[in-house]
Every structure is written in C-alpha cells, then in structure tokens.
Amino acid sequence: MSRIKVENLEQEIRSMIAEIAERDEEEIKDDLNFVEDLGFDSMMALEMLAKLEKKYRIRIPEEELSMLNNLQQTVDLVKNLLSAKE
C-alpha cells in the first residue's frame, strides 16, 4: 500500500462515515461506536460496507463485519485488506 494511501485512508473513511451518519467530520472520533454513538442502523452499515468495498476494491469477509464498530477498527481492517492485496 502506498504511503499516500495510508496517510489519507483515515481521513477518507472518516469523511465517508460522517456523510453516512449525517455528522460533521470533526464529530467522528476514532473510538465512537457506530451504533451506540452515531446512530448507525443496518442500512447505514450496509451503505458503509458497499462504499468501502467499491472505493478500495476490497472484499470484506462476513466474519469481519462484527469487527467494524468504530473508525479505528474500520481503518485497521481496510489497511490489512489492502496490504493483503499487494
């Protein structure tokens, strides 16, 4: 994964989550729970999943979905999946 992608990855995903949650990017902290703190429902989670898979050309395995509870976990998973593609 290129250095530029790594540096921008967190900001890109933060922006994506803010758009889905209809919040300002500054409100999306690394450890805020998507469901409890940001009000995500199943449709919002599916929207995030679809956007992540399309933007980064990755496939997030079903067993990994339960690990996507906050920004930091999501960034870490996407980094790992991108690294595995190289």
Predicted regions and their residues:
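Thiotemplate assembly-line natural product biosynthesis machinery
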Residues: S2-E26, V78-E86
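Generic structural marker for isolated residues within well-ordered, non-membrane alpha-helices
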Residues: R14, D31, L49
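Short coil/turn motifs that cap or connect alpha-helices
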Residues: D24, R59-P61
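N-terminal helix-turn-helix DNA-binding core of bacterial DNA-binding proteins
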Residues: D31-L38
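Two-component histidine kinase catalytic core, primarily the HATPase_c
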Residues: M44
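Glycine-centered, phosphate/nucleic-acid-interacting loop/turn motifs that mediate DNA/RNA or nucleotide
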Residues: Y56
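AMP-binding/adenylate-forming catalytic domain of the ANL superfamily
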Residues: E63-Q73
